[in-house]
Amino acid sequence: MRTVRDAKFVPQWVDLTQEYPAPLFGHITRQYLNLSYGGHPLQAVDLYLPEEGKPPFPTLILVHGGGFSRCDKRDLSVYPGFYALREGFALASVNYRLVPECRFPCQIHDVKAAIRFLKGHAGEYGLDPRSFFLYGDSAGGYLVSMVGATQHGSSLDGGAAGPEGESCAVRGVAAIAPLINLVRHYGQLERVDYLSPDLHKAMLEESSAILADYLGTPKGRLGALAEKASVDTYLTSAAPPFYIQHGTRDTIIPPIQAIDFAGRLRGLIGGEKVVLDLIEGAKHVGTSPEFIEEEHVLSILRFFRTLL
């Protein structure tokens, strides 16, 4: 069985001497690190500009996963963004406040604040504020989906974070293995039939604990917050185009979450604006190599190019 270490990496982009592959940044000459979009140390974004091409650049805003409680903007989840740089996109990798210090919905507010910050400074860094795209995996996939679903104003807008008057609207969203519906998730995971009994039990326990921590509720008792924190709750015909990528053997977030999400979106914004990319045999992002390999990343970037 292939693991992340078995991915078809670009050698100069990754350090394989560590236990878990780590991205390398030496090939990027134009870097602006730890740009602050808020008062907390984790409210920061790293910005990288392409080596070639003329500004203003379309911009990929990347939001890492990690169960809302861990990982960082310079972890391996940034690696797909290196392909975006090569293809002429600027890359912005975002940190956000983590559980338990910060719970729903502050992570959503943070991502929106980062978008507003980047738009407010677009001229300074050579970014095209009309061509911003979101990319997130796992918990990051949930966050970018929430931002996309609520980008035109809702109770989750987060107030006037970022430069006055800037919109957090984006041109398109790539959601990789996203959690979409918190109400149905546990029952869907219970019905997964491709896990061993021991692994199935462990995944149910882990999932229950992650969501309880994120919402600040007792484990197994998410209550009304589960609906309030579900992407489905906010979907309208104003949603941006989506590229949804998911593994058919995901052990943490069942692929039915992506399938149902794509179906709802197609009914609201039209089938031509929604791509559902199910990767046969792939497990959860971060454990399977497919999501960081060139063919699967370029398919997303090609979709984004059609939206420019």
Question: What are the functions of these language-model segments?
Answer:
Residues 1-308:
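Alpha/beta-hydrolase superfamily serine-hydrolase fold, recognizing
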